[in-house]
Amino acid sequence: MAKDYNPSRRNREAFEALTETPGNVPPQAVELEEAVLGALMLEKDSIIAVQEYVTPDAFYTEEHRTIYRAIEELSMELKPIDLYTVTERLKAKKELKKVGGASYLAQLTQKVG
């Protein structure tokens, strides 16, 4: 029988895999980072499940650390976290271009699955 698709479980597994590796992980984990960031922008309240375990330092690239910090800030302000709000936060901080622009953020949401 086919395994049921459970996005929350899959994303939790991705978050756990990201945090199990001590220090910075090699560049081949960039795809995992992309999926994690994409999931955070797609799944309501997913930041609550990972904030205790994932810090900006868990991300290998500075761009991903910057995106994660923006997501954390929105969470601390009790604001919704989605593609639009993350884009606007990065734009307000003049960091949107630094992370690859709105199109890169949109691509991150397509990495989940």
Segments and roles (model prediction):
Residues 1-113:
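Noncatalytic partner-interaction/assembly domains of nucleic-acid and motor enzyme complexes
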